[in-house]
Amino acid sequence: MRGKTLLAPSLLSADLMNMQSSILSLEGEHDWLHVDVMDGGFVPNITFGPGFVGALRGAFPDEVLDVHLMIEQPSRMVDAFITAGADYLTVHAEADHHVHRTLSRIRENERKAGVSINPGTSEEIIRPLLPFVDMVLVMSVNPGFGGQTFIGTMMEKVTALARWRAALGLSFLIEIDGGVGRQNAAMAARGGCDVLVMGSAVFGTPDPASTLREIRNIVEEADERA
Ligand code: DX5
Ligand code: ZN
């Protein structure tokens, strides 16, 4: 049986001038904090670095920090994010020539290793890596910005990954990122997503905590039926 669906608000859509109060506005209704790291090369945007992750870790020692690296050659930077205090560290398969080595490095440091694929990348690419990951992040928009529209066909990747996971006896989590919100959370949970990343759908609402409570009810109902 699946575990309960986890909710991971993305700080990309938080109030950058008031990060601490944005996080507190979640009132603990979330499971993880998702941190989008962008380098202006792999994606056409620049966001947070290890210093930000370290500051988060210092201010919120008990939070699960889910760090999504949308950067070229992530192997050069994983040590810095490990030191900063990331719990989950996810690298893009498209950005690294030696993803297995990078994933191993993350795990050697007792952090959870994730691999991600863009909408245009087949899940077949990461099939050989599945025994070496704690999470697969399926991008359901082209990474770079919040507030984009969910690409529904990406759920086919989730189905394939869940099937392979069962066949191989593995236990990695499947995370979906981009365009997720109240309108499709039940479908995503029922379709096999274990972690829902949500930026604008949470921080773009007047009361993020009550939005999360609503989405929690929606996914719990879906979990019961799954
Ligand atoms: C997109 C990022 C996402 C983003 C999602 O490149 O990886 O995590 O914050 O934002 P929404 O939920 O608004 O699509
Ligand atoms: Zn992300």
Regions found by a protein language model. Give the residues of each.
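C-terminal helical cap(s) of enzyme catalytic domains, especially alpha/beta-barrels
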Residues: 106, 189, 204-226
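Short helix-capping segments at alpha-helix termini
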Residues: 59-63, 108-110, 165-171, 220-226
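N-terminal amphipathic alpha-helix/helix-capping segment at the start of soluble metabolic enzymes
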Residues: 1-13, 20-21, 223-226
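A short alpha/beta connector and helix-capping loop motif
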Residues: 43-74, 185-202
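Hydrophobic faces of well-ordered beta-strands that scaffold small-molecule active sites
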Residues: 5-10, 33-35, 56, 65-69, ...
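Glycine-rich, proline-tolerant flexible connector loops at the mouths of alpha/beta enzymes
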Residues: 34-50, 141-149, 206
